[in-house]
Amino acid sequence: MGGDPAPRGDFAVLTDADLAAFREILGDDNVRTDARSLDACNEDWMRKYRGNAGVLLLPARTSQVSAILRHCNARGLAVVPQGGNTGLVGGGVPVHDEIVLGMRRMNAVLSVDPVAGTVVCEAGCVLEDLEHALNARGMTAPLDLGAKGRCQIGGNVSTNAGGLRLVRHGSLHGSVLGLEVVTADGTVLDLVRTLRKDNTGYDLKQLFIGAEGTLGVVTKVAMLAPRKPTGVDVAVCAVGSFADAVAALRDARTKLGDCLQAFEFFDRASLELVLSTLRGARDPLPKTKAPFYVVTETAVFGDGSGKGSVTHRAARRRVRAWVRSLRKRGVAIDGVVGEDAKHASALWNLRERISVALKHAGAVYKYDVSLPTERMYDLVVETRNRLAASTSASTSTSTSASTSAASTSFDASKVSVLGYGHLGDGNLHLNVSSPDGYHPGLEAILEPFVYQWTAEQRGSISAEHGVGAMKPRELAHSKDEASIEAMRRVKEVFDPRGILNPYKVLPPRLTEHRSKL
Ligand code: FAD
Ligand code: 2HG
Ligand code: ZN
């Protein structure tokens, strides 16, 4: 799990006087110290990371966020901004006793402009709620992810979440037009703009996109809200090899072109897990036991009456024809196109809910990497080989890869390695499921191997989930020391006392390391 947690920094300890100051700012109800509130905000979605915050603060306005941070900065109290707490790298929960700043009360959609195709909302707006508000105006959010029912737009911006439709909408670095951010000393940066063009010096908002709460608290977001399609089609194709999955992607880019919204893949192990774990999940192509599956989503706009536009029926015919042509040319073994919205959503769920199935199965080691598309699945194969080699090197089914056998042995026969992800973006989700729990021995087989292998391909050790508490010490696999040092200097500009989300993203300086030894 990324080794031992970083030692507690030299931050102040929360006192009754601090709680009284917070109550003054927020009112009694929004300063939570009860066990239920603290349990929920101290533990992450995977139940892998757990902190020990003594208070959860729930502001409703930017001015309150500003007053809280002013107080914390003056006192030297550490703070973790928390959105929907669906992050997968332990970034949104405390490592030690940091104060949790929950954004859920700041959830208003402030303005929607259907002509410009823009929306402004508060950071605590749940992505699915925003989607519904936009759908009512014929618009859609520029991102979609499996956690949409819980994650917040401020969390999405702060992690630079990618998700399922990046193929169509691009990254949030392009879709976000403006932000309001409160920096560590309580300063409010009003960078909220809905302009498409604004070349007035440094584009400061970009620094906060993907900063994971280490530079400031995002309080408002302005972003593009594209037109909602009048119809979508989902197809699942079974393919005989990963190379065929890549060939199907290449083909889709030319044949489905502008309509393509998503191009995802999963392997057989992922499908088996979903089928055995999630109620109602059905094999999309029960006659074929393929090693890989690709999922496409295509969109149609308009009602077919305008020049060059097609009806949804015609668009679906086009997708069916594409699937048929893949089969005819031997790229796909079989394929199915969703017959209606219910069928389409059942097909999507097979891909979208793999993480939920993994959570049901027990402990899981997650790696979220960017790699050259053709080589993406090699990492899954290499990981399986490595696991098998260490298992056969062991005398029994229990294996130990580290010094203390008693604490590191695990039953390798229960461990499974899954590969799935956003094929259209070159983003692999390598997941190693260990139903019996986390084991240092298993971790030693996986790390630093996965990071080193990724670095050798000049990939990224975090494609979309971020660095959080999991990977600060691995950052050097994806960034050189000069770049990491530049990041530290940026941190010092916005948060000189280092109170915002300490222990996350940035690795400690070597000198800091040494002084602690
Ligand atoms: P949190 O988990 O609460 O926080 C995440 C980070 O952002 C933390 O560092 C936190 O401190 C910071 N933060 C949160 N809010 C603010 C704020 N207002 N200001 C400053 N910092 C803030 N991720 C993807 O990229 N693509 C996917 O397809 C995807 N699918 C997922 C599917 C499931 C089932 C789950 C559980 C997770 C998935 N994720 C995915 C990961 C996660 O949902 C995203 O990282 C999401 O953007 C996190 O949003 P959140 O509101 O839950 O943030
Ligand atoms: C997805 O694409 C998410 O489903 C989660 O990014 C991936 O759980 C994971 O590893
Ligand atoms: Zn993903």
Predicted segments, located by residue:
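Noncatalytic alpha-helical scaffold of FAD-dependent oxidoreductases
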Residues: 1-517
